[in-house]
Amino acid sequence: MADSALLIVAASEQDANLYYATHFWAPDSFIFTQIAGKKILVMSDLEVDRARAESSVDEVLSMSRLQAQAKKKGISPAGTTEVLDILYKERGVQKVEVPATFPVALADRLRDKGYTLSIRPEPFFPERSVKKPEEVAAIREAIRCTEEAINSVVQVIAQSEIRGDELWLQGKPLTSELIRKAMHLHLMGADCLGRETIVAGGTQACDPHCIGSGPLRAHWPIVLDVFPVSMKTRYFADITRTVLRGKPSEKVKTMYRLVREGQEIGFKMIKPGADGKAVHQAIMDHFEKNGFHTGEVNGRMQGFFHGTGHGLGLEIHEAPRVGGVKDILQEGQVVTVEPGLYYLDAGGIRIEDDLLVTAHGCEVLSKYPRELVVGD
């Protein structure tokens, strides 16, 4: 017997740690606990058979059977707290580690039953950041789908007509909404789901998380930041390209060159043992020494004011970080490198690729061309 357990009570559809531990996808909350290395699910009658067939855990218990046990002991109705109490008493558990997102009311009720609860800091499963070969394969597949979706709309932008300072297609202004919808439809055809996909032009692109709206401008950069999830594997890809239809200004051309160079700095530095903070600082320094400064100007942040990258997997943003905080990279992690420059008089430039940290450096998993000007 072990006197301690891990516990997550959530819906795996919304909790990547829970899905990672169980490989069971469900929209409603269920109980996962790990005792002495043994993974256990407690499932409703609706899901118990599917969980036994699909999950990767060691044991699947019936919620209704545990409730029946509680009723024999005079406990009725028996909810999650009472069911866990029966299970933990049977197995000698006294201490429980939970994630920071654990429901407060349930935590209070378990403490009232005499259990000692503590929060296990993220990463809840430290091994999750180092990807197994099958996880890397899943990310590669999501990347290929993403690149195809990006290519489909880059061709549309390249074929658009320049009318004044706007792009037109088939007699109508070409809008962020039309491009986003086209990408989402392409992704759906490949069993991927795109949400909040960024198609931002003009000064909208100076806000890195603005998804973009309205007509797209000629001669200004258009940021395409695409981060779909595979509905088959549940793994994400995350790729950004910046394109322009028309004639870029000299400032935009310089910004694009510097961002590409910043990416190359990241590619060369990323390897096992590298500090994500040092990678980020090297790119910041490259921009600064070339005269592209970061700070607030007339009430708006301009320059390079976000992190260089983040881990990628079952979540779009997960450990490790490549930014302003020390984080040592390990072989097998998948990270993004996505420097950017943003100025209201020129627009936004961001280029993002996904990298696998290898034994002696990194492999760039995303291969889509990095070209600013598209079309004739």
Which residues make up each language-model segment?
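Active-site neighborhoods and metal-handling regions in enzymes and metal-associated proteins
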Residues: 1-376
